[in-house]
């Protein structure tokens, strides 16, 4: 088999969070091939008006990917189109993934703020 068939992007999500957290991210771990389509869900229950998705590669600081604030979605222009956000309401910010590349292997983090 060719290298492309064996290649997969490993997406690790923050798993060490306090039990009483009001921001949840699911699934906590995700391994997917380059042709799969998956979604990451970020949900907050604090009434915050802003939500964020970050990408953090090994030994690098987090990079802001998307912001949903006051019912407006802002997209970092450097984020490839294989990542697409969806905000069905002010407490959810989903991240849809498709056709990932090996360089997409990273820690994906969601957050919220007032």
Swiss-Prot record:
Keyword line: Adaptive immunity, Cell membrane, Disulfide bond, Glycoprotein, Immunity, Immunoglobulin domain, Membrane, Receptor, Signal, T cell receptor
One Gene Ontology CC term in the entry: plasma membrane
Family matches, as Pfam families: V-set (PF07686)
Chloroplast among keywords: no
SS bond partners: 42-110
Cell location: Cell membrane
Entry's Gene Ontology BP terms: adaptive immune response; cell surface receptor signaling pathway
Signal peptide: 1-21
Entries under Gene3D superfamilies matching the protein: Immunoglobulins
Sugar attachment sites: 76, 89
Residues annotated as domain Ig-like: 22-114
Role noted for this protein: V region of the variable domain of T cell receptor (TR) beta chain that participates in the antigen recognition. Alpha-beta T cell receptors are antigen specific receptors which are essential to the immune response and are present on the cell surface of T lymphocytes. Recognize peptide-major histocompatibility (MH) (pMH) complexes that are displayed by antigen presenting cells (APC), a prerequisite for efficient T cell adaptive immunity against pathogens.
Assembly mode: Alpha-beta TR is a heterodimer composed of an alpha and beta chain; disulfide-linked. The alpha-beta TR is associated with the transmembrane signaling CD3 coreceptor proteins to form the TR-CD3 (TcR or TCR). The assembly of alpha-beta TR heterodimers with CD3 occurs in the endoplasmic reticulum where a single alpha-beta TR heterodimer associates with one CD3D-CD3E heterodimer, one CD3G-CD3E heterodimer and one CD247 homodimer forming a stable octameric structure. CD3D-CD3E and CD3G-CD3E heterodimers preferentially associate with TR alpha and TR beta chains, respectively.
Record's protein name: T cell receptor beta variable 4-1
Organism (species): Homo sapiens
